[in-house]
Curated annotation (Swiss-Prot):
One matching Pfam family: OSCP
Keyword Membrane: yes
Subcellular location as annotated: Plastid, Chloroplast thylakoid membrane
Purpose of the protein: F(1)F(0) ATP synthase produces ATP from ADP in the presence of a proton or sodium gradient. F-type ATPases consist of two structural domains, F(1) containing the extramembraneous catalytic core and F(0) containing the membrane proton channel, linked together by a central stalk and a peripheral stalk. During catalysis, ATP synthesis in the catalytic domain of F(1) is coupled via a rotary mechanism of the central stalk subunits to proton translocation.
InterPro entries documented for this protein: ATP_synth_OSCP/delta_N_sf, ATPase_OSCP/d_CS, ATPase_OSCP/dsu
Keywords linked to the UniProt accession: ATP synthesis, CF(1), Chloroplast, Hydrogen ion transport, Ion transport, Membrane, Plastid, Thylakoid, Transport
Main location: plastid
Membrane topology qualifier: Peripheral membrane protein
GO molecular function: proton-transporting ATP synthase activity, rotational mechanism
Similarity comment: Belongs to the ATPase delta chain family.
Annotated protein name in UniProt: ATP synthase subunit delta, chloroplastic
Length: 187
């Protein structure tokens, strides 16, 4: 979910324009659903992302691929937006545009996206407990978790929001202990 800051800056006006359009045309729910599904689809098909991002491939070829793969799957206006991105050579920014658009939607709806890295997969009870606590801390109406499993953390979890990182991992505790021992003990 981490995206190049320059790409985010370039993507922001496109996301804002689509967000404003979706609000004006009362299409926010459809376009948001399309983008959420598209985000998952692109993560599962890195070859398509690579193909669309390749500057050596013509806009016409990219348009044909989008016609075959997505036209029947998404809203007409979402598809038109993708074609605009292809024609303006900005389809390579699709992932940051999706992220920026979804952030605009979530901010408007008081939904917070929070990244959680954990050593082991959470149970539903653990997810629900974490969501409840995060709602209290952030005053958000809704919390969306993006959970990644990273066995190098040994145990515990790491929470990342836009402005904060909360590290409750065993790996972090061991690193702190090692630093403390290094400063206290002279060998």
């Amino acid at each position: 979910m981490s995206i190049n800051p320059l790409a985010s800056k370039i993507a922001a006006p496109y996301a804002r324009a689509l967000f404003d359009f979706s609000v004006d045309q009362n299409l926010m729910h459809q376009i948001t659903a399309d983008f959420q599904n598209l985000e998952v689809f692109l993560n599962k098909t890195p070859d398509l992302t690579e193909y669309l991002s390749n500057p050596l491939i013509s806009a016409k070829s990219k348009e044909e691929v989008l016609n075959k793969t997505l036209k029947s799957q998404i809203n007409k206006e979402t598809f038109k937006f993708l074609i605009v991105l292809v024609n303006r050579s900005r389809i390579n920014l699709l992932e940051p545009i999706i992220a920026s658009y979804l952030n605009l939607v979530y901010n408007a709806a008081s939904v917070k996206m929070i990244e959680v890295s954990t050593a082991y997969a959470f149970t539903n009870l653990q997810k629900n407990t974490l969501i409840k606590k995060l709602k209290e801390l952030t005053n958000a109406r809704e919390i969306r978790l993006v959970i990644t499993v990273d066995s190098s953390l040994i145990g515990g979890f790491l929470i990342k929001t836009n402005s904060k990182v909360l590290d409750f991992t065993i790996k972090n505790q061991l690193q702190k202990l090692a630093k403390h021992l290094d400063s206290v003990l002279e060998i």
